[in-house]
Amino acid sequence: MCLIYAGIKETTEDIVCYKMYVSSFKGKLVSPYMRSPMPNMNEVTKTRLGKPYGIGSCVDEGFHSFATLEDAISESECWTRHYDCDPIIVRCIIPKDSKCYIGSFWGKTAYCSDSIKLIEICA
């Protein structure tokens, strides 16, 4: 997933977001684009946050998520139609004091952050 960068901020409060996962060939849940394993639920997980690059200022390194459940479901429906899979959507929190890019992915408001906490499977 490549976020089209609009701005960066250090979060001053927790941000609720929604992340999609799909089953891998080995039956594990992974992120759909980078195939990163799904972190443990209810634990803050950190990763490297990439820098914007190229035309449109894409950001591909970090935890990508959607601002609304509706946008995450819309993206998961595309995966269901085109890749014959059954994605899950997880409600997450980008914790306070995280670094977070705000931008868009296929016209949907999205985030790319250096940390995330998975809360519950919601769709």
Outline where the language-model segments fall.
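Conserved NAD+-utilizing ADP-ribose enzyme module
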Residues: 1-63, 67-123
